[in-house]
Amino acid sequence: GGGLVIKILTEGYPVVEILDTMILQPQSEIGKVRRFLNEHNLQITEENMVEEDGKFYPMMKVIHGKKEEYTICEYTYGKRLLLEQHPVLKKYLDREMQIKESVFQQLFKHQNSASAAERMEELKQEIILTQEALKYYE
């Protein structure tokens, strides 16, 4: 996952420094990986995403570079994927939106509990972020 990618890059930094290019495929915490790369002047020059058997696999080409400006949405979903209006990312975003809205509706029925109300608030923020990403496709 993403945590392991960050650990490998951190512990292996002497090797990272001499590499011209890296291809990374974090399977979780992808936003954290993007943020880590940017904070360490490692620039994502290309991103791709594929889907197989209903699972989505992001990948990125990384070189030494300089820090870039990223929004939270771009860290979360991939600046290059969003700017390119990547079709597989669009499919992922549509699915995420359906899932989040469905969970929100289920929680709405049980909003009396504090934990449901708290999760609903988290979901609202996630839905807003996903909607922001979907605006790239308009």
Predicted feature residues:
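Active-site segment flanking the S-adenosylmethionine/decSAM binding pocket
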Residues: 1-13
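Amphipathic alpha-helical interface surfaces
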Residues: 4-5, 33, 58, 89
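Conserved beta-strand signature within the Rossmann-like core of class I S-adenosyl-L-methionine
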Residues: 13-31, 43
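Active-site capping/gating segments
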Residues: 28-32, 37-69
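An accessory alpha-helical subdomain
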Residues: 70-138
